[in-house]
Regions:
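Hydrophobic positions on the alpha1 helix immediately C-terminal to the Walker A/P-loop
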Residues: 208
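Conserved glycine(s) of the Walker
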Residues: 204
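Hydrophobic alpha-helical signal peptides and transmembrane signal-/tail-anchor segments
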Residues: 2-26, 35-40
């Protein structure tokens, strides 16, 4: 309620300011003043909202009447009442800075039907050009300082895809040195503990979560695509819900201690085994977001991964998409 009241108050004040400004200058035919007025309208009518995910706060700045806010419904459970310490601020702009001298660093794409992300270095900053598919044209431009603290982005395509991608990437990059991993995983909760299911796209992570929910009493879904793992100050490992949950609308602002992490593999026979520390490290390594060639980011991801696999039991599950696989996994990882 406090956030809504403040936003409403700022909206009224900004509109009043613009109205008075127009009354004062309407009769004066001065082009420069009208240009300045348009600039003020844009600045004063912008809206800033703060969100908190896994204990990390970030801000989004967009025009207050922009349709893009309609795509922020998944973020509403994560609204924060004040700024606090922000890990990043992302602002939507109509015009990007000049990037003509950009130098390509790398291109990431996990398949023809997956987003393509091109990373450039440009005037001491990072520039990301993002397309929704491998062969699709660029639809999002994102430029950020090297610390991933201040970002500007321009959207040319789908607002839902663009906003989700920009904020998810910024969150992953900005938290890489903060004992935090943005995972590619489905998470099911049972008896106050959370169980993460890892695996390549199409392996059956969501299916396995649903098998637990449908066959084992008292299970519920926390997140179906991008939960957040965090090593807490006391050394414990907790998993948090996030606004990013893939095709399943599951946006829970809650967190649980991690009971186990399970790497899934499709097979003709159900079989499970405990992973060694090295195996667990590798299994986790391919399941979280971040650029490994940026040394500071890689060091942070490595340190967090080490802490997690040294604390949380990790397993490999060869499985069929059936109830027997769910029971085998549940009975093993909850012992």
């Amino acid at each position: 309620m406090v956030v809504e009241f403040v936003e409403a108050l700022l909206f009224v004040v900004s509109r009043l300011f613009v109205f008075l400004f127009i009354l004062s200058y309407f009769s004066k035919k001065n082009v420069q003043r009208y240009v300045f007025l348009a600039y003020l309208c844009t600045k004063f009518c912008s809206m800033k909202r703060v969100y908190q995910v896994a204990g990390h706060r970030f801000a989004v700045v967009m025009p207050d009447n922009h349709l893009a806010w309609n795509e922020m419904k998944p973020y509403e459970p994560f609204l924060a009442e004040n700024d606090g310490d922000l890990i990043f601020t992302a602002e939507m702009v109509d015009v990007m800075p000049d990037t003509s001298d950009k130098q390509k660093i790398t291109v990431n794409c996990d398949g023809a039907d997956m987003p393509r992300i091109e990373l450039y270095e440009c005037q001491g900053q990072w520039l990301l050009e993002i397309a929704p598919l491998l062969e699709a044209p660029v639809r999002v431009y994102l430029i950020t300082d090297k610390a991933f603290h201040t970002a500007k982005f321009r959207v040319l395509g789908s607002m839902r895809f663009s906003l989700g991608t920009v904020l998810m990437l910024m969150f992953a990059f900005a938290t890489a040195k903060k004992n935090t991993l943005l995972m590619h995983s489905s998470v099911t909760v049972k008896d106050g503990k959370a169980y993460l299911f890892l695996g390549k796209s199409g392996t059956g992570k969501s299916t396995h979560s649903q098998l637990w929910i449908n066959t084992i009493e008292g299970c519920e879904l926390l997140n179906d695509d991008n939960p957040v793992l965090r090593v807490m100050d006391d050394g414990s490992v907790r998993v948090f819900g996030s606004p990013w949950s893939g095709k399943t609308p599951c946006y829970h602002n809650s967190d649980y201690p991690v009971g186990a992490i399970v790497d899934l593999h499709q097979a003709k026979v159900n079989k499970i085994r405990r992973l060694s520390l090295l195996e667990a490290y590798v299994s986790m390594y391919v399941s979280f977001s971040g650029y490994r060639f940026i040394k500071e980011m890689a060091d942070g991801l490595h340190a967090t991964n080490e802490k997690i696999v040294g604390t949380v039991p990790c397993y490999s599950l060869d499985c069929l998409p059936n109830a027997d696989a769910a029971y085998l996994c549940y009975n093993t990882v909850t012992q």
